[in-house]
Amino acid sequence: MLSCRLQCALALLSIALAVGTVSAAPSDPRLRQFLQKSLAAAAGKQELAKYFLAELLSEPSQTENEALESEDLSRGAEQDEVRLELERSANSNPALAPRERKAGCKNFFWKTFTSC
């Protein structure tokens, strides 16, 4: 009977200690500061991750814009060249009529047959 009372007393004492330590844990100022810092750091990491994600998403659009600009410049240069060729051909002597080719005519030129 004595051992049963002793076991109950020890069980109640251990439960009381467990409840006391659990209720006392959040009131520890160092632990509270640590938790607040870790939450702030987690929020900062999320913001940092969002920032890097936005940077990564904007990089392809920037490179696409640069590629489009370079294509526009090359197209403009090609158009200028075509315009200059047209002006030269208009100002020069009348062009000779292109050689008329017969159907099925083949010439031997540099080891191969070419059509006329």
From Swiss-Prot:
It is found in: Secreted. Residues 1-24 form the signal peptide. It comes from the Eukaryota. One of its GO terms (biological process) is regulation of cell migration. Coiled coil: none annotated. Keywords: Cleavage on pair of basic residues, Disulfide bond, Hormone, Secreted, Signal. GO terms for molecular function: hormone activity. The keyword Mitochondrion does not apply. Residues 72-82 have a biased composition (Basic and acidic residues). Disulfide bonds join C105-C116. Residues 25-88 form a propeptide. Residues 60-82 are annotated as: Disordered. Its main location: secreted. It holds the Pfam family Somatostatin. One of its GO terms (cellular component) is extracellular space. InterPro entries: Somatostatin, Somatostatin/Cortistatin_C. Belongs to the somatostatin family. Somatostatin inhibits the release of somatotropin. This is Somatostatin. It comes from Gallus gallus (Chicken).
